[in-house]
């Protein structure tokens, strides 16, 4: 969602604030702004649109000051125009905010009755006026923050600077993440480690309910009970700095091409590739005591768990429930002690998924999280973490994090099967060898990049696309449809191939192509029958299959993307790549913003 940066420095901070905001662009935004304190006075510049517009304004109106805050806004309350951009200011303070204040209408009404006027449609302005009211009553800055905080319902992370105070910044967290960076006589606050990595190499993460007072003399963090607390200081790993596109046109293109390498790192963590065995997770989880797995996730991460369901059921004979996190958290389902709850999230900050994790913990259920950000809130709160090791992912549409989630889940399923006695030593060697081949095969698929771009030229003028898949290819079809609509803004829907005749076939005509994900596996013949139904109605088919599948298909109405022949087990990981390339090239041909699609955020930290 929104991105926050705050700097209490030794020199003019405006350019550094912009640099920090650029590192937060991947989160998605529609406006931006910065505010500084110079000689006790507050100054602010904001702009609608991309950061380049803010930079142009700053050239005309430079901001001085060694204390400042910055923000990239993703609209929730109020349209994406400059007046709604952060920071918001009053005569006493400037504030940036990530989150949603659920009772802002009630608070706004109260403040209006007291004579306060509102210039924006945002919920953030309510916080600004609440703190200002408290300051006018004679409270200190710290007391004003604490008093106002008690009135707020919802999720928020805020950073505040004050008129007349060149050496004070206060940050508070109730939900969305905040990190503090420690420099030499200067300090930083940011939404995540990526924002701070170019300034410092030591950070601490604020816990839920924390608030912090920053001066050039040091940082004091207070817990929810308002008592000083010590939070562990983490040294940033080198990969946090790797946010350059290199020779690639877009971050997404770079991240797709990084998949062979990052999956190699992932597999080395979970597999003994010298002996072709799974590294045991027994010190974390005793699979013999587990009778059911509960997955709760959102978006692309949810689709990874749909694939995993097949693996855990087939290999480990475990019952699996898959839930969309935003639905699960409001159902209050009964959960027993023999359940392992698993939460998948690239950022580890997804609000709905985090709420599900907390629900399961409160009910005494063992919790595991599969995340890409190992210092995230979910990683800290779960009983144990399975890192995906994908490295920083900047493109809003997930690519390498998704395939690393699949690889992690595949290794996890093999370990469960091995512990439960349903996986022979021979089968273990066989499946681990198959996983070890994934990086090499992905490199082969990447050689089809140019061919896939040519096929995508036929998609730029369509009015919609259907994706079909069966078995483990069904979740990949769902992910393909999601990727295409995220990036190209073409309406796309994914369906289980067997559901075609139960409604979607009514949409089939020459203007709506059907993309079929169908390796030559045990489901291929049935999927081929569905393809023939499409062809009989003059539908246009794009078939993603392997050499054997292409030989069998032989339909005149299709374009074919032919992948190497591969085992059924690893097919979902391999077939994820061509559906990513289809979405990417279609979006590029249409001229959309591939790395930052409209209305989307990388880290969804509010409901």
From Swiss-Prot:
This molecule's function is given as: Catalyzes the first step in hexosamine metabolism, converting fructose-6P into glucosamine-6P using glutamine as a nitrogen source.
Q: Name one GO cellular component term.
A: cytosol
Q: Which UniProt keywords apply?
A: Aminotransferase, Cytoplasm, Glutamine amidotransferase, Repeat, Transferase
Q: Which CDD domains match?
A: GFAT (cd00714), SIS_GlmS_GlmD_1 (cd05008), SIS_GlmS_GlmD_2 (cd05009)
Protein's organism: Bartonella quintana (strain Toulouse) (Rochalimaea quintana)
Q: Which Pfam families match?
A: GATase_6 (PF13522), SIS (PF01380)
Q: Enumerate the spans annotated as SIS domain.
A: 277-422, 455-597
- Which residues constitute the catalytic centre? 2 (nucleophile), 602 (for fru-6p isomerization activity)
Domain (Glutamine amidotransferase type-2) ranges: 2-217
Name where it mostly resides: cytoplasm
BP GO annotations: carbohydrate metabolic process; fructose 6-phosphate metabolic process; protein N-linked glycosylation; UDP-N-acetylglucosamine metabolic process
> Which reactions appear under catalytic activity for this entry?
D-fructose 6-phosphate + L-glutamine = D-glucosamine 6-phosphate + L-glutamate
The record ties this protein, via InterPro entries, to: GATase_2_dom, GFAT, GFAT_N, GlmS/AgaS_SIS, GlmS/FrlB_SIS, Ntn_hydrolases_N, SIS_dom, SIS_dom_sf
Q: Where in the cell is it found?
A: Cytoplasm
How is this protein organized at the quaternary level?
Homodimer.
Q: Which Gene3D superfamilies match?
A: Glucose-6-phosphate isomerase like protein, domain 1, Glutamine Phosphoribosylpyrophosphate, subunit 1, domain 1
Gene symbol here is: glmS
**Entry's EC annotation:** 2.6.1.16
EC top class named in words: transferase
For molecular function, the Gene Ontology terms on record are:
carbohydrate derivative binding; glutamine-fructose-6-phosphate transaminase (isomerizing) activity
Coiled coil spans: none
Q: What is this protein called?
A: Glutamine--fructose-6-phosphate aminotransferase [isomerizing]
């Amino acid at each position: 969602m929104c991105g926050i940066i705050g700097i209490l420095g030794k020199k003019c901070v405006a350019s550094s604030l912009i640099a920090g905001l650029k590192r937060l662009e991947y989160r998605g935004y529609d406006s931006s702004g910065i505010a500084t304190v110079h000689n006790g006075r507050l100054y602010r510049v904001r702009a609608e649109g991309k950061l380049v517009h803010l930079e142009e304004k700053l050239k005309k109106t430079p901001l001085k000051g060694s204390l400042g805050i910055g923000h990239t806004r993703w609209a929730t309350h109020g349209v994406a125009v400059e007046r709604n951009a952060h920071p918001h200011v009053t005569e006493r303070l400037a504030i940036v905010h990530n989150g949603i204040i659920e009772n802002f209408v009630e608070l706004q009404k109260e403040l209006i009755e007291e004579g306060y006027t509102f210039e924006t449609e945002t919920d953030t302005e309510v916080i600004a006026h609440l703190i200002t009211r408290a300051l006018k009553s004679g409270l200190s800055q710290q007391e004003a923050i604490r008093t106002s905080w008690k009135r707020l319902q919802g999720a928020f992370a805020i950073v505040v600077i004050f008129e007349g105070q060149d050496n004070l910044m206060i940050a508070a967290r109730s939900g969305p993440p905040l990190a503090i960076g420690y420099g030499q006589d200067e300090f930083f606050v940011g939404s995540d480690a990526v924002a701070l990595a170019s300034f410092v190499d030591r950070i601490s993460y604020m816990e839920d309910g924390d608030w912090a007072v920053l001066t050039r003399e040091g940082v004091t963090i207070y817990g929810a009970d308002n008592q000083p607390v010590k939070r562990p200081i983490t040294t940033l790993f080198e990969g946090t700095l790797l946010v350059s596109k290199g020779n690639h046109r877009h971050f997404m293109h770079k991240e797709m091409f990084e998949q062979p390498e990052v999956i190699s790192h992932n597999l080395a963590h979970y597999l003994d590739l010298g002996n072709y065995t799974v590294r045991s997770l027994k010190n974390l989880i005793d699979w013999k005591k587990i009778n059911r797995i509960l997955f709760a996730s959102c978006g692309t991460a949810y689709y990874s768990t749909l694939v995993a369901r097949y693996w855990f059921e087939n290999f480990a004979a475990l019952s699996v429930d898959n839930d969309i996190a935003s639905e699960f958290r409001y159902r209050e389902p009964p959960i027993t002690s023999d359940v392992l709850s698993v939460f998948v999230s690239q950022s580890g900050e997804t609000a709905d998924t985090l709420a599900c994790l907390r629900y399961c913990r409160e009910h005494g259920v063992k919790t595991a999280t599969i995340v890409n950000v190992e210092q995230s809130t979910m990683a800290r709160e779960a009983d144990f973490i399975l890192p995906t090791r994908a490295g920083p992912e900047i493109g809003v549409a997930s690519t390498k994090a998704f395939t690393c989630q699949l690889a992690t889940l595949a290794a996890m399923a093999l370990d469960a099967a091995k512990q439960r006695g349903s996986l022979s030593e021979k089968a273990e060697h066989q499946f681990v060898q198959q996983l070890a081949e994934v990086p090499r095969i992905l490199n082969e698929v990447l050689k089809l990049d140019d061919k896939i771009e040519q096929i995508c030229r036929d998609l730029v003028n369509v009015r919609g696309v259907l994706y079909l898949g069966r078995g483990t290819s069904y979740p990949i079809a769902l992910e393909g449809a999601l990727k295409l609509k995220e990036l190209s803004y073409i309406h796309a829907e994914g369906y289980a191939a067997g559901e075609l005749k139960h409604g979607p076939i009514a949409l089939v005509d020459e203007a709506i192509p059907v993309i079929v994900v169908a390796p030559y596996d045990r489901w291929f013949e049935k999927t081929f029958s569905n393809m023939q139904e499409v062809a009989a109605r003059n539908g246009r088919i794009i078939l993603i299959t392997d050499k054997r599948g292409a030989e069998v298909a032989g339909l005149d109405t299709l374009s074919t993307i032919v992948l190497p022949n591969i085992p059924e087990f690893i097919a979902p990981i391999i077939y994820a790549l061509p559906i990513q390339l289809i979405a990417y090239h279609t979006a590029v041909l249409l001229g959309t913003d591939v790395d930052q699609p409209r209305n989307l955020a990388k880290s969804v930290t509010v409901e």
